Amino acid sequence: MSKRKHESSDSNKKAMKKQQNKIEEEEEEITNTTTTTTTTNNNYNNIKSNLTIDQWIPKKETFSKRYYEILEKRKELPVWKQKEDFIKVIKENQVVILVGETGSGKTTQIPQFVVDAGLIRPGKMVGVTQPRRVAAISVAKRVSEEMDFELGEEVGYSIRFEELSSARTFMKYLTDGMLLRESMSDPTLNKYDVIILDEAHERTLSTDILFGLIKDILKRRKDLKLIVMSATLEAGKFQKYFENAPLIKVPGRLHPVEIFYTEEAAKDYLESAVRTVIDIHTNEGTGDILVFLTGEEEIEDTCAKIQRETRERGLPPMKTLPLYSSLPIYQQSKIFDTCKERKCIVSTNIAETSLTIDGIVFVVDPGFSKQKTYNPRSRVESLLVAPISKASANQRAGRAGRTRPGKCFRLYTEKAFKELMIQQTHPEILRSNLASVVLQLLKLGVVDLVHFDFMDPPVPDTLIRALEVLHYLGALDDEGQLTEIGSIMSEFPLDPQLSKMLIVSAERSCSNEILTIAAMLSAPNCFMRPKDNRIEADSAKKSFDHFDGDHLTMLNVYHSFKKNGEDPTWCYDNFLNHRAIKQADSVRSQLARILTRFKLPLVSGDVNSKFYYENIKKCIAAGFFMQVAKCEKKNIYFTLGDEQSVIFHPSTGLTRRPEFCIYNEFVLTSENYIRTITDVKFDWLLELAPSYFKQKSFPKKTKETIQRAQRLYSGSSSGSSSGSNKK
């Protein structure tokens, strides 16, 4: 097995181990706090309804020195000046729309104003949604400090597969997806007195569904208040949707920002971004730099180039920091640290509105972001690099004017900004696969999807395709009603395909293996590929690669991780992301609890059986039979159904080219790639999803492929008896 070479062995290893131990202690502390929450909640719930507001929300008599230091900074925020006006309006109205530019303080202060106004009754909470996990965690941490409480006690957070709260929590920051999931077990959101939908301008899929659900709940719960907060002037649309709710405007940008455009479009926006950062560092005054890029690989490569250029040119030191959602929390928090040298933060659009970073004076904006797209006819959902909207460009520029006059360097022409960029990014609901959301709505009893109160109704084609997908997966019957399997599928915080894969795994005696694969697919990528060690990293990955494909490779990684005692050093040596696999381990435990709740047995297959890997692959195929590709020639495949010509993504460990394979992702970049691939036999697909493959609407080449396979299958099965493989 390939091992990572350490340049200065002993000192580096000791430092690395010390850092990893620190991470482990932090993660263990979070886990312990979360576990304690579960046991104390039940006892406390019995008495908290009898408490007064003063007993429920503690009135502290003594505060730390840091509390008073932070308080002075809070009073300088633009939103603080409107505290009394806001409290008056929210007391008099059930719904309030608040527009405040990024940096106005609305995300941290408005929930505290709600508490100060006495609007949270004993045993109830104010829930604040965020579109991104990193924002939910970082803002909860900040607010707990501002209120002089310990994170996870009075102020907590909840993201997918992770919650830090207690029986004393009266303020909770959570992702919009988590609030949507909570509504399935608490349809009237009874635990909340006030709900704040923050960053509503981002129009995520979950936020748009919450608009419709909460609008209906407000009619039944006159004691519930809703605050919709946006960083852009889409307020008129929100006001109209919520029956002319009052609008409060809060100024945000404290200082002017000078905008610079390029004379012509950059041929390579990454090279142009690096060059611009070096020019700023060489020729401009003090102040930190924020660069917007589209994804993890771009960001890591650009950080390395900036560091190398700075070093080779003999420039003053500059701390270059990456920021993206899958980055470990302890690394994300470094962007808030103060340091003597200039900071250059290279980020996805997570820094556009979700996080406020003090000290930014210069912004570099290439004008691109990764955006989700969905083709309902081909059922292909992809992340594409696409131009941003004018609203996003203005948000990015606004990051530079927080603490003093700033500059924004746009790596595109003024003409492109004025004539080519759209005004607002299209709502996610208009460009997403809706199968998961439709399943949740059906579970909530929303059967008339066509007349559901969407702010922007999705095209009928998208809803029809979502219903078709759920029907083929067995979640809906022929009348469109939720089946027993569909009801169980809705309980998993997963895509319907993964849920189906889990449910059928018990029948084939491999639920433990499928749990592992589902968990690994739900966590960040476990393989690390540093720019300077790519050959060694690729060699290390090959030692885990499975002959049959990437899903089984993930199983190998997890088993090796457990066999080696979850050792961070072992992960480091083998170019594995320790935190990602630990997260997968935590996800696995939660998914196992859901299986147990529905009395689905946790069993492992006999690894020595000739059917061991076949049963695992059949379970994967039971969820992903709609994502099949057939080999057409050497390295070229075509996808069944939409007949797209595709090739394997370079990251796959499947070196041979099987006739048929299933894939998890369709990736559109310079090529049409399929990623996370496993070899399957077509007769399995006919056995697992006969109704899907009997469709008359398939295009010609797909029909011919299916008919040919059916003839081969019927011919081979008539000449031999096929026993059950469920052993």
UniProtKB/Swiss-Prot annotation:
Ranges of Low complexity composition bias in the record: 31-41
Family membership noted in the UniProt record: Belongs to the DEAD box helicase family. DEAH subfamily. DDX15/PRP43 sub-subfamily.
E.C. code: 3.6.4.13
Species of the source: Dictyostelium discoideum (Social amoeba)
Stretches for region Disordered: 1-41
Domain Helicase ATP-binding: 87-251
Hydrolase is among the record's keywords: yes
Gene3D superfamilies: 1.20.120.1080, P-loop containing nucleotide triphosphate hydrolases (3.40.50.300)
UniProt xrefs under InterPro entries: DEAD-box_helicase_OB_fold, DEAD/DEAH_box_helicase_dom, DHX15_DEXHc, HA2_WH, Helicase-assoc_dom, Helicase_ATP-bd, Helicase_C-like, P-loop_NTPase
Subcellular location: Nucleus
Protein name: Putative ATP-dependent RNA helicase DHX15
Residue span of motif DEAH box: 198-201
Any one Pfam family match given in the protein's UniProt record, by short name: Helicase_C
PROSITE patterns referenced in this protein's UniProt entry, alphabetically: HELICASE_ATP_BIND_1 (PS51192), HELICASE_CTER (PS51194)
